[in-house]
Curated annotation (Swiss-Prot):
Record's function text: Intracellular vesicle trafficking and protein transport.
Gene designation per UniProt: RABA6B
Coarse class of the protein's main subcellular location: membrane
InterPro entries: P-loop_NTPase (IPR027417), Rab_GTPases_membrane_traffic (IPR050209), Small_GTP-bd (IPR005225), Small_GTPase (IPR001806)
Lipid sites, type S-geranylgeranyl cysteine: 226-227
Compartments reported by the entry: Cell membrane
GO annotation, biological process: protein transport
Protein transport found in the keyword field: yes
Domain of life where this protein originates: Eukaryota
Identification of the protein by name: Ras-related protein RABA6b
This protein's GO CC annotations: plasma membrane
Disulfide feature: none
Family annotation (NCBIfam families): small_GTP (TIGR00231)
Length: 229
């Protein structure tokens, strides 16, 4: 169950990005996840936008900083700074427009060119509420995800279907990857319970902090910060 928390202190920051063609629903997915809002008159993103949401992992509060960028070619100059430091990505297409699915290969190639090999990627087929206009079958999305080693699900920002699941599965997997890396690094360094790469591994504790993850406090913002337990 999610609950609102406007002033809760946060322990760590995870940056994630939304990627895909213009008008696939990136902004509405972000507003649905961060503020539980949906706008039928949503306008294309100009440049870059971002929002926060707090997620509880073990005994830590993680602030998920989700970045949304315009899908238009004229904004591609911001590419490198947009991807820098991203630990996760939602790769989004519109199930009613096949061209947006075909372009996933381009977006994935760009992501892999600018991000770490450990970046967690979730393939998202959005607008599942428009099944009568579907041009991309769900099985096609699953097949592509399996071939590329991605997670997959279909969402509807309008009906709030699988939106939580898409973001939280990404954040949860980021936590798993970082925890495994910390444990492995500590074993290689012979420091089972000592500090390594900016993290401490206490017995029985879940670890989320390495050099890519930054300790932070909530910023003063009008956006809702929700904790998921």
């Amino acid at each position: 169950m999610a609950e609102e928390s406007y002033d809760e202190e946060c322990d760590y920051l995870f940056k994630a990005v939304l990627i895909g063609d213009s008008a696939v629903g990136k902004s509405n997915l972000l507003s649905r996840f961060s503020r539980d809002e949906f706008r039928l008159d949503s306008k294309p993103t100009i440049g870059v936008d971002f929002a926060y949401r707090n997620v509880r992992v073990g005994d830590k509060t993680i602030k998920a900083q989700i970045w949304d960028t315009a899908g238009q070619e004229r904004f591609r100059a911001i590419t490198s700074s947009y991807y820098r430091g991203a630990l996760g990505a939602l790769l989004i297409y519109d199930i009613t427009r096949r061209i947006t699915f075909k372009n996933i290969e381009k977006w994935l190639s760009e992501l892999r060119g600018f991000s770490s090999p450990e970046t967690v990627v979730v393939l998202v087929g959005n607008k599942s509420d428009l099944g009568q206009s579907r041009e991309v079958e769900e099985e096609e999305g699953k097949t592509l995800a399996e071939s590329e080693g991605l997670y997959f699900l279909e969402t509807s920002a309008l009906e709030n279907q699988n939106v939580e699941e898409a973001f939280l599965s990404m954040i949860g997997r980021i936590h798993e990857v970082l925890t495994q890396k910390i444990v492995l690094d500590n074993r290689l360094n012979g420091d089972g319970n000592n500090e390594s790469n900016g993290a401490v591994v206490p017995p029985g504790k879940e670890i989320v902090n390495i050099h890519e993850v930054t300790a932070t406090r909530p910023l003063s913002t009008s956006l809702s910060n929700c904790c998921y337990k």
